[in-house]
């Protein structure tokens, strides 16, 4: 059991026998009223999203999800097929089931992912915290403005756009932090 004040992003709770992922949690306490936790939730089975408010002392059922290592096997339209690395079982997910990690998934990637199961059903996939990708396009370096951290836009092979350091060129391998939408960490050491 968890209380409302213990909710944080990444926590999974059970509501009406469905697993709900806490995507955002904001604790608020005012002088007159009791403390509350404002949350954004996503149903892991249906993909439905909602905003809910819980009291700090509300009791909630937490859910323990099963996790297995998997790799991306292939992409067919909006269907992504992952393979269990231990028993080679294939699992399929639709694009909307993995929308949070979709910008970092590309055909031929070798990253080992974490397949997340609820009652033997694959509900999502988590990528490693840091992944390495190749820059497919970026503009040339800007001359003169080198007093601070100079960033410029870049595009990855799968079309994802992000800001990278000014010295990054086309073809460079970069490290990306996949948490919170993804951000440039630095040049990859290859």
From Swiss-Prot:
InterPro entries: Elong-fact-P_C, NA-bd_OB-fold, Rib_uL2_dom2, Transl_elong_fac_P/YeiP, Transl_elong_KOW-like, Transl_elong_P/YeiP_cen, Transl_elongation_fac_P, Translation_prot_SH3-like_sf
Coiled coil: none
Compartments (UniProt record): Cytoplasm
Keyword terms of this UniProt record: Cytoplasm, Elongation factor, Protein biosynthesis
Pathway: Protein biosynthesis; polypeptide chain elongation
Cellular component terms (Gene Ontology): cytoplasm
GO molecular function: translation elongation factor activity
Family annotation (CDD domains): S1_EF-P_repeat_1
Gene3D superfamilies: 2.30.30.30, Nucleic acid-binding proteins (2.40.50.140)
Pfam families: EFP, EFP_N, Elong-fact-P_C
Family (UniProt): Belongs to the elongation factor P family.
Purpose: Involved in peptide bond synthesis. Stimulates efficient translation and peptide-bond synthesis on native or reconstituted 70S ribosomes in vitro. Probably functions indirectly by altering the affinity of the ribosome for aminoacyl-tRNA, thus increasing their reactivity as acceptors for peptidyl transferase.
Protein name as it appears in the record: Elongation factor P
């Amino acid at each position: 059991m968890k209380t409302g004040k213990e909710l944080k992003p990444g926590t999974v709770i059970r509501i009406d026998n469905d697993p709900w992922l806490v995507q955002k949690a904001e604790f608020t306490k005012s002088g007159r009223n009791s403390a509350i936790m404002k949350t954004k939730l996503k149903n892991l089975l249906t993909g439905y999203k909602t905003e809910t408010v819980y009291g700090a002392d509300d009791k909630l059922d937490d859910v323990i999800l099963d996790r297995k290592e998997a790799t991306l096997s292939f992409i067919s339209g909006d269907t992504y097929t992952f393979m269990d690395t231990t028993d080679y079982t294939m699992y399929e997910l639709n694009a909307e089931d993995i929308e949070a990690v979709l910008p970092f998934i590309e055909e031929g990637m070798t990253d080992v992912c974490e397949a997340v199961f609820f009652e033997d059903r694959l509900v999502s996939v988590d990528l490693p915290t840091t992944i390495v990708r190749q820059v497919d396009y970026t503009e040339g370096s800007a001359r003169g403005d080198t007093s601070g951290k100079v960033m410029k836009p870049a595009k990855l092979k799968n079309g994802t756009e992000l800001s990278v350091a000014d010295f990054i060129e086309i073809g460079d391998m970069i490290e990306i932090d996949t948490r919170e939408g993804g951000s440039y960490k630095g040049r990859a050491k290859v």
